[in-house]
């Protein structure tokens, strides 16, 4: 298949994700800075974790918190030392992007994977405007890549460039018929690795259709939520929620075409009810894991978020 032009809804382009910085700039920072005193950082205390980073060790002084005694330095020097901390001035933000095969589906305007990349880019641009450090984790059946949070624009542009290249690589493979089986453990494994790279006090965005969600994912999300703030964007396509009117419809993977019958009104009603029930169950599971969530369709305008 010949590569489509930018903003086709199938392939990702650099300009498409870069332009979202203008939307982020128009809307302004999501969280306003506050003055919390001498040690105050830019955020209220709803952030999880200590929000402090190690600065140095010095000789223990009366009144120091005994919980902060640096036992290694104490043992090495023979004198009691205590750890000094400074409050983190920037919040780490991690963008977790699902590029597994189920995300490469779309019936209108764009693929779920394209919409996920767009909202991830927008959230990243907004974080940079707030002065936060932005990193990312993206994964598919063939790759898992991690980018440590940094506060400079060039680093974020490299992250976006990697998202574009990996996304378009999968599209290219699919159009050539190079299919891979989806592992039911892919999402859980990605979240397990996220737990090891996310710093306490981070804001973690997850962009996925959550088709791979299971009990193992629930465990990892719950552990993550103890020290970080989690926000999930559940990406869906209109055709997943509601079957089209009765008739025969062509569906294609870019190479082969199949015809499906949408059935009668009762069948379509069952179809919609099944989606709604599955979504309600997922929402409950995520809320129990202390994950705030938002639904996002492939036809939604991300600039309104």
Where would I find each of the regions flagged by the language model?
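Conserved active-site region of classical short-chain dehydrogenase/reductase
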Residues: 121
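Exposed, interaction-prone extracellular/peripheral surfaces
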Residues: 2-43, 59-64, 73, 82-118, ...
């Amino acid at each position: 298949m010949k590569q489509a032009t930018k903003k086709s809804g199938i392939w990702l382009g650099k300009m498409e994700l870069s332009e979202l910085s203008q939307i982020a700039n128009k809307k302004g920072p999501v969280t306003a800075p506050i003055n919390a005193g001498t040690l105050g950082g830019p955020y209220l205390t709803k952030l999880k974790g200590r929000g402090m980073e190690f600065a140095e060790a010095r000789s223990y002084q009366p009144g120091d918190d005994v919980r902060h005694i640096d036992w290694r330095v104490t043992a090495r020097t023979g004198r009691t030392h205590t750890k000094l901390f400074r409050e983190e001035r920037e919040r780490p933000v991690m963008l977790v992007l699902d590029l597994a095969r189920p995300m490469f589906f779309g019936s209108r305007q764009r693929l779920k994977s394209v919409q996920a990349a767009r909202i991830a880019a927008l959230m990243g641009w907004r974080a940079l405007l707030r002065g936060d450090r932005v990193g990312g984790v993206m994964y598919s059946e063939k790759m898992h890549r991690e980018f440590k949070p940094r506060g400079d624009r060039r680093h974020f542009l490299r992250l976006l460039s990697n998202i574009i290249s990996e996304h378009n690589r999968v599209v290219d493979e699919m159009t050539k018929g190079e299919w891979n089986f989806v592992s039911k453990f892919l999402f859980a494994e990605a979240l397990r690795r996220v737990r090891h790279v996310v710093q306490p006090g981070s804001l973690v965005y997850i962009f996925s259709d959550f088709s791979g969600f299971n009990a193992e994912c629930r465990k990892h999300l719950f552990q993550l939520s103890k020290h970080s703030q989690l926000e999930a964007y559940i990406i869906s396509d209109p055709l997943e929620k509601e079957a089209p009117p009765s008739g025969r419809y062509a569906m294609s993977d870019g190479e082969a075409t199949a015809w499906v019958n949408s059935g009668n009104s009762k069948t379509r009603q069952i179809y919609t009810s099944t989606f709604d029930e599955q979504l309600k169950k997922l929402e409950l599971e995520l809320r129990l894991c202390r994950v705030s969530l938002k639904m996002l369709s492939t036809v939604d305008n991300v600039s309104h978020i």
